Swiss-Prot record:
There is a cross-link at residues 1-29 (Cyclopeptide (Gly-Asp)). It comes from the Eukaryota. Transmembrane segments: none annotated. InterPro entries: Cyclotide, Cyclotide_moebius_CS, Cyclotide_sf. The lineage of its organism: Eukaryota, Viridiplantae, Streptophyta, Embryophyta, Tracheophyta. Belongs to the cyclotide family. Moebius subfamily. Disulfide bonds join 5-19, 9-21, 14-26. This is Cyclotide psyleio A. GO terms for biological process: defense response. The presence of a 'disulfide through disulfide knot' structurally defines this protein as a knottin.
Length: 29
């Protein structure tokens, strides 16, 4: 889906549901 979750994942984790870390940003389908 939308590629940007509006979240970064410098710590390696994403807090936004449905998002995964593609360093250094969170992405989703």
């Amino acid at each position: 889906g939308l590629p940007i979750c509006g979240e970064t994942c410098f710590t390696g984790t994403c807090n936004t549901p449905g998002c995964s870390c593609t360093y250094p940003i969170c992405t989703r389908d």
